[in-house]
C-alpha cells in the first residue's frame, strides 16, 4: 500500500481497525456467555478488506 493515503481511505482503515477488537468482558458476563466473541473479527493475513 502506498505511503500517502487519501483521507477517505485512511478513515475507512481506521474504522476497520476499531471494529476489529474483542467484545468487553462485561458483555459476556451480563449475557451469561450467550455472546462469546465478536462476529466480525478479522486477521490481516487471513482475510482482506474489500473496496478500501
From Swiss-Prot:
Determine if Ribonucleoprotein is one of this entry's keywords. Answer: yes
Signal peptide stretch: none
- From the UniProt record, which GO molecular function terms apply? structural constituent of ribosome
| Superkingdom of origin | Archaea
Q: Which UniProt keywords apply?
A: Ribonucleoprotein, Ribosomal protein
Tell me yes or no: is Chaperone among this UniProt entry's keywords.
no
**Do you know which InterPro entries this protein is assigned to?**
Ribosomal_eL39, Ribosomal_eL39_dom_sf
The record ties this protein, via Gene3D superfamilies, to: Ribosomal protein L39e
GO CC terms of this entry: ribonucleoprotein complex; ribosome
**Entries under SUPFAM superfamilies matching the protein:** Ribosomal protein L39e
Which positions are tagged coiled coil?
A: none
Q: Which Pfam families match?
A: Ribosomal_L39
Q: Which GO terms of type biological process are on file?
A: translation
Q: Which family does it belong to?
A: Belongs to the eukaryotic ribosomal protein eL39 family.
> Which HAMAP family does the annotation name?
Ribosomal_eL39
Annotated protein name in UniProt? Large ribosomal subunit protein eL39
Species for this entry? Desulfurococcus amylolyticus (strain DSM 18924 / JCM 16383 / VKM B-2413 / 1221n) (Desulfurococcus kamchatkensis)
Species lineage: Archaea, Thermoproteota, Thermoprotei, Desulfurococcales, Desulfurococcaceae
Amino acid at each position: 500500500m502506498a505511503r500517502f493515503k487519501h483521507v477517505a481511505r485512511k478513515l475507512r482503515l481506521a474504522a476497520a481497525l476499531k471494529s476489529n477488537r474483542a467484545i468487553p468482558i462485561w458483555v459476556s458476563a451480563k449475557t451469561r456467555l450467550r455472546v462469546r466473541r465478536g462476529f466480525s473479527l478479522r486477521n490481516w493475513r487471513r482475510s482482506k478488506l474489500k473496496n478500501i
